[in-house]
Design a protein with these regions (language model features):
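Pair of pore-lining "gating" transmembrane helices in MFS-fold secondary transporters
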Residues: 1-6, 83, 197-208
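Central cavity-lining transmembrane alpha-helices of secondary-active solute carriers
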Residues: 18-41
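C-terminal ends and interior cores of transmembrane alpha-helices
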Residues: 33, 54-73
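Cytoplasmic membrane-interface "Motif A"-like loop-to-helix N-cap segments
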Residues: 43-57
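Glycine-rich segments within core transmembrane alpha-helices of 12-TM secondary carriers
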Residues: 111-134
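C-terminal membrane-cytosol helix-exit motif in multi-pass small-molecule transporters
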Residues: 127-136, 152-170
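Juxtamembrane intracellular "pre-TM" segments in multi-pass secondary transporters
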Residues: 166-204
């Protein structure tokens, strides 16, 4: 296949490809870190946890589909798709984990969580093997189609959870109350972090 140079151009700026990749991931993680506490507070008030998880899942799937059009000469689009896919994955995972107390008693949390992760890893390995087989046996031109497969696989296997997980939407509070609840959760996280210097140093090191 085509060999991509180590240096790529992104919005007119030349960067090492791995450097750009790290920057995009770090920015997407930062967005998730800021949004998650706010959205979890909004979800608690509105009862729309499942709806928010669907939005993130759809965004992540669309990001994967967008990587089909990955083009080294147009890194802006390619990195935008990666950015969206990463936000979709980590954003939906937060709501996914929040459902555990609603679907199982406390003494079954560990078992159910381990089972869920095991099934997820099995599914991802099966898809990985399929994608590798397409690339190695059919040809490298199938590489873009593997991103399409990932997007479809992700969204398709999310449907059983979307149908079965409890959803208890309530009448939406005023916009002001929703925003206030979101910032309240964000302040709570900030206060919690202020007492954990090691974690703060780790986060600074991660993003820098």
């Amino acid at each position: 296949g085509e060999i991509i140079n180590d240096v790529v151009t992104f919005w007119g700026i030349e960067l090492i490809n791995t450097q750009l990749y790290s920057y995009v991931l770090a920015c997407s993680f930062l967005i998730v870190i800021i949004l998650s506490p706010m959205l979890s507070g909004i979800a608690d008030v509105s009862g729309r946890k499942l709806q928010l998880m669907k939005i993130f899942c759809l965004a992540g799937s669309l990001g994967c589909l967008g990587l089909y059009a990955f083009d080294p000469s147009h890194m802006e689009w390619s990195m935008s798709a990666l950015f969206l896919a990463n936000i979709g994955f980590w954003g939906s995972l937060g709501f996914y984990n929040a459902f555990l107390p609603q679907i199982a008693p406390a003494n079954e949390h560990d078992k159910l969580s381990a089972t869920g992760f095991a099934m997820g890893y099995i599914g991802s390995v099966l898809l990985l093997l399929l994608c590798l087989a397409l690339i190695m046996l059919v040809g490298s031109f199938m590489t873009p189609w593997t991103f399409v497969l990932v997007g479809i696989w992700w969204f398709s296997w999310a449907q059983p959870a979307f149908r079965k997980l409890p959803s208890t939407p309530t009448k939406l509070p005023t916009q002001g109350r929703l925003i206030a609840q979101g910032f309240k959760e964000l302040r709570k996280v900030a206060r919690d972090l202020s007492g954990r210097k090691e974690l703060v140093r780790f986060l600074w090191g991660f993003f820098i």
